[in-house]
Design a protein with these regions (language model features):
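A generic structural signal for tightly packed, nonpolar segments enriched in small/aliphatic residues
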Residues: 55, 204-500
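Short amphipathic alpha-helical segment within the helicase RecA-like ATPase core
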Residues: 1-269
Length: 500
């Protein structure tokens, strides 16, 4: 999708469609939908339809007017943004996605989006607004129906953002939005592929190709390296599969980076999770192709980081393998020695994510990472706790949490902190080894995080359980159902926050 800025008055922009935001300023029984444009010609064009009460400004209400009077655009799209009081850049991002999804389904290929500029209501900084619109438009332009023979792949080819302000700053914001939006779609593309088309080896290849394009260092190692590093927990999972595992390392080492800070991003890359010997029921097992979403998120985040060039050192480690039952597979009761030296009693081979991450976290620390973030589709229990809305967030350090929460707020993604009290340690006690890999069902997401905490040790660490949020169960106005690319935006903001 081509993107460009226009500094004309919205009413003077020649386009197939001009999209504008309508907000609900109503109080008590007094309805008041206001077109967020300082251009009176645009407001006049929408006056009649607003007067009928048909347009209220409620969230994701879309009204398409043809041949609107007094403006140059062929159509005017009124996008309801909800209550004016709560409107923010996060809503604007979704509205841009909704505009794209509405218009591309009508075979429109190019349109213009007017930055809400009345300001009275939104108070969104112009640069943040442009970035949000571009990100949202890219997210909305992605469809996952790759393998349909009659795939239409309708897309928006060109987006013009009508804005006011400092051209250089707005161009930068647009570039940032493009990089982050495209990187999120890159992640979604990886996650979307089925396991026969995204084996650990293929994930490694995709990471390598991307790294070469954006100038990152990349290494992809196989089973020999796992054994050399004594990654007994990772190998325990990988040993049951005929597909070789891949230990993927991406390095971003800018000049003039912040001293003494080395961020480590660790991603779960299970390209298919059958459960292993503790096999999953057939019902819904096909979804376990997205069990590499955490890894794909880290690969996509590294792409964005390489292009945005924040001055902070970042290393990503992705643990990619299948989790399969076979004559070589690990069995319940087996004991594995993790890279850190800790012994793990395998209670349930389906609790494999924490095993691969244990060695990933340990390796990141060995490589000198000073701060760690992991992302993983780790537990069904996090879906029970938080549904399909919030990412489960855990932290072993409040300062690290505060930093991450700030970045998360800027990114506008739903995340919710869950506890890690020492009292939960009971749940991962083993009678024959240091810890078990699967505790009781209650508090399942926390038990998994407690397990990981043992391997983050004293390094400040954030764990993101994205099992409920990495895959959208339904179409939304702004995003297609399927892989969401969740957490990437927060991660990129977090990394940028450390730059000197
Ligand atoms: N990959 C799953 C978790 C998952 C569930 C991801 C639903 C996405 C949607 C993970 O490896 C798993 O199987 N976890 C088990 C752990 C249990 C055996 C302790 C679970 O949540 O049931
Ligand atoms: Mn599993
Ligand atoms: Zn899994």
């Amino acid at each position: 999708m081509n993107t460009n800025l226009s500094f004309s008055a919205p009413s003077q922009v020649e386009t197939d469609c001009l999209a504008v935001v309508v907000l609900d300023h109503s109080e008590k029984d007094k309805p008041a939908a206001i077109v967020e444009s300082a251009d009176t010609a645009v407001r006049d064009a929408a006056k009649d339809v607003i007067a009928t009460g048909e347009v209220t400004g409620k969230a994701f209400e879309t009204t398409l007017l043809h041949r609107p009077a007094g403006i140059r655009a062929k159509r005017l799209l009124l996008l309801g943004g909800g209550k004016a009081k709560t409107f923010s850049a996060a809503e604007l991002l979704k509205l841009a996605g909704a505009a794209v999804r509405t218009l591309k389904s009508k075979s429109i290929r190019a349109f213009a989006f007017a930055l809400p500029e009345n300001g009275v209501a939104t108070g969104i900084d112009g640069n943040d607004g442009v970035r949000a619109i571009v990100e949202g438009a890219f997210v909305g332009n992605f469809d996952p129906d790759y393998y349909k023979s009659d795939r239409k792949d309708q897309k928006i080819d060109a987006l013009t953002i009508v804005a006011k302000g400092d051209q250089k700053a707005l161009e930068d914001a647009l570039q940032t939005g493009r990089i982050v939006g495209e990187s999120q779609n890159f992640t979604r593309d990886l996650v979307n592929e089925p396991s026969n088309r995204m084996t650990p080896t293929m994930l490694g290849e995709r990471a390598r190709k991307m790294a070469a394009e954006v100038g990152l260092k990349c290494e992809v190692h196989g089973a020999d390296k796992l054994k050399e590093l004594k990654m007994g927990a990772f190998w325990g999972v990988a040993q049951g599969s005929d597909e070789p595992p891949a230990l993927i390392i991406l390095r971003y080492e800018p000049e003039g980076a912040t001293k003494d800070v080395h961020l480590g991003l660790v991603g779960k890359g299970i390209t298919f999770d059958t459960g292993g010997i503790s096999i999953k029921p057939a019902d819904g097992m096909e979804k376990m192709k997205y069990d590499m979403a955490g890894g794909a998120t880290m690969i996509g985040a590294m792409r964005a980081i390489a292009l945005l060039k924040p001055k902070v050192r970042v290393t990503a480690i992705i643990l990619a393998t299948e989790n399969m039952p076979s004559g070589k597979a690990q069995k319940p009761g087996d004991v594995q020695i993790a890279m850190s030296g800790k012994s793990i009693e395998i209670i349930n081979t389906d609790a494999e994510g924490r095993l691969v991450l244990a060695d990933g976290l340990c390796y990141a620390r060995q490589l000198g990472c000073t701060h760690l973030v992991d992302a993983a589709t780790l537990t069904g229990a996090v879906v029970v706790a938080l549904g399909y809305v919030n990412v489960g967030l855990f932290a072993n350090d409040d300062q690290m949490y505060e930093r991450f929460a700030k970045a998360n707020k800027r990114a506008g993604e739903n995340m919710w902190r869950l506890p890690l009290d020492d009292d939960y340690k009971e749940n991962i006690k083993s009678s024959i080894a240091d810890i078990v890999n699967a505790g009781p069902r209650h508090g399942g997401a926390i038990n998994a995080a407690m397990f990981l905490k043992e391997f983050a040790e004293d390094t400040p660490w954030i764990h993101l359980d994205i099992a409920g949020t990495a895959w959208m169960e339904e179409n939304k106005p702004w995003i297609a159902k399927g892989p969401s690319g969740v957490a990437l935006r927060s991660l990129v903001e977090f990394v940028k926050g450390w730059a000197s």
